Amino acid sequence: MSDQEAKPSTEDLGDKKEGEYIKLKVIGQDSSEIHFKVKMTTHLKKLKESYCQRQGVPMNSLRFLFEGQRIADNHTPKELGMEEEDVIEVYQEQTGGHSNV
């Protein structure tokens, strides 16, 4: 397959609308999965807000990673090279680095 976006074949035309959206899996530390369908050009802040709302936690208490890199609010799936069924990992944000013992 090539990455060229020349004239779409008839096969591609049927999938064109579907191609604007991708399904992403968001997996929490407890291995729970939530699936999201997002536009390739949507800022991932919307996905992060939606996930946090479903989990009932503030957005700043979690960090979202794609392929080991932190996802910024203004990133889009297109910018990050995301594809169908890609996985976003969610971890508790850790603050501090020492104990007071």
From Swiss-Prot:
One of its GO terms (biological process) is roof of mouth development. Keywords: Acetylation, Cell membrane, Cytoplasm, Isopeptide bond, Membrane, Nucleus, Phosphoprotein, Ubl conjugation, Ubl conjugation pathway. The keyword Coiled coil does not apply. The keyword Ribosomal protein does not apply. There is a cross-link at residue 97 (Glycyl lysine isopeptide (Gly-Lys) (interchain with K-? in acceptor proteins)). Ubiquitin-like protein that can be covalently attached to proteins as a monomer or a lysine-linked polymer. Covalent attachment via an isopeptide bond to its substrates requires prior activation by the E1 complex SAE1-SAE2 and linkage to the E2 enzyme UBE2I, and can be promoted by E3 ligases such as PIAS1-4, RANBP2 or CBX4. This post-translational modification on lysine residues of proteins plays a crucial role in a number of cellular processes such as nuclear transport, DNA replication and repair, mitosis and signal transduction. This is Small ubiquitin-related modifier 1. It comes from Ictidomys tridecemlineatus.
